[in-house]
Regions:
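Conserved acidic catalytic loop of the alpha/beta-hydrolase fold
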Residues: 1-10
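Acidic beta-to-alpha connecting loop that harbors the catalytic carboxylate
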Residues: 131-133, 171
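Short alpha-helix in the alpha/beta-hydrolase fold that links the catalytic acid
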Residues: 123, 136-147
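Catalytic active-site module of serine/aspartate enzymes centered on a nucleophile-bearing elbow/loop
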Residues: 157-207
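Short, conserved loop/helix-junction motifs that constitute active-site signature segments
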Residues: 29-30, 118-122, 147-150
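Alpha/beta-hydrolase-fold enzymes
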Residues: 14-103
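Active-site nucleophile elbow and catalytic-triad environment of alpha/beta-hydrolase enzymes
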Residues: 96-117
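Short beta-strand/loop motif that positions the catalytic acidic residue
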Residues: 121, 127-129
Length: 207
C-alpha cells in the first residue's frame, strides 16, 4: 500500500517484538530499504533470560494456551493481559520450537511460497536489544537475524545505564520518556543507514 500511495518513495520500517519478525514474513519485504527492529524475536523459550525463563515459560507456554483451550480464544482484555487473541495465534506463539518454519504459521508460509520469505529482505537492518529485556536476549535476537540472510545486519546492545536509566525492559523503547535518548538511534538509522559516532551501547559481534 505504501508503494502504491507514495510511488518512488523509499520504504523504511520499524518493528517492535514480533513486529520485527513480521517485517520478514510479508511478500513485500523486498521493498524495504531500511529496517529497525527493537527486541525482535519469536519467543523461543530457551532464549528467555535465565533468571526469568521458567516464570515466562509457565505464563506464555502453559497458562496462556490452557486459558485459550478453555475459552476458545485468549480473553486478554478481561484478564488485563494483552488484547483478546484468536486461538490459532496463541497456538502459534506458544509452540516451543527453535525454528520458525516448524511453527504452524511458518509451515503455512513455506507451503504457499516454497520457502521462508525472510531471505527476500535486502534492507539495511539494525536490530536493537536492551540488556534488561528478558525476551530480547542476544541469542533471541541473533536467532531471528539469522533468517535475514539477504540483508546487511547490525545488532546494537544497549544497557539502561548507557542512557542514564536504571531499567528499560521490553516495552518502553517507544514511550515518550525515551524520546531524547533512544528514538534518535532508530531515526538516524532510517535516515542514513548507519549509527552516529556517539550512539549509546555496543555492536554485538556477528559470525
Amino acid at each position: 500500500r505504501a508503494q502504491r500511495e507514495f510511488p518512488g518513495q523509499p520504504i523504511d520500517v520499524v518493528g517492535h517484538s514480533f513486529g520485527g519478525c513480521a517485517a520478514g514474513l510479508g511478500a513485500s519485504g523486498h521493498l524495504i530499504r531500511r529496517l529497525v527492529t527493537v527486541g525482535a524475536q519469536f519467543a523461543y523459550w530457551r532464549d528467555y533470560a535465565p533468571e526469568h525463563r521458567w516464570r515466562m515459560f509457565a505464563k506464555w507456554h502453559v497458562l496462556m494456551p490452557l486459558v485459550t483451550m478453555i475459552c476458545g480464544y485468549f480473553p486478554g482484555k478481561r484478564l488485563g493481559w494483552l488484547e483478546d487473541t484468536p486461538a490459532g495465534v496463541v497456538r502459534d506463539w506458544s509452540l516451543s520450537t527453535a525454528r520458525y518454519e516448524k511453527r504452524s504459521s511458518g509451515r503455512a508460509i513455506s507451503t504457499t511460497s516454497g520457502q521462508m520469505p525472510f531471505a527476500g529482505v535486502t534492507a539495511q537492518t539494525l536490530a536493537i536489544s536492551i540488556s534488561d529485556d528478558p525476551y530480547g536476549t542476544v541469542p533471541a535476537i541473533e536467532r531471528l537475524l539469522g533468517y535475514f540472510t539477504g540483508s546487511t545486519n547490525s545488532h546494537l546492545r544497549i544497557h539502561p545505564e548507557d542512557i542514564g536509566e536504571e531499567e528499560v525492559g521490553h516495552f518502553a523503547f517507544f514511550r515518550s520518556p525515551y524520546q531524547a535518548t533512544l528514538w534518535p538511534i532508530a531515526l538516524a538509522w532510517l535516515q542514513h543507514g548507519e549509527l552516529a559516532p556517539d550512539t549509546p551501547g555496543r555492536r554485538v559481534p556477528r559470525g
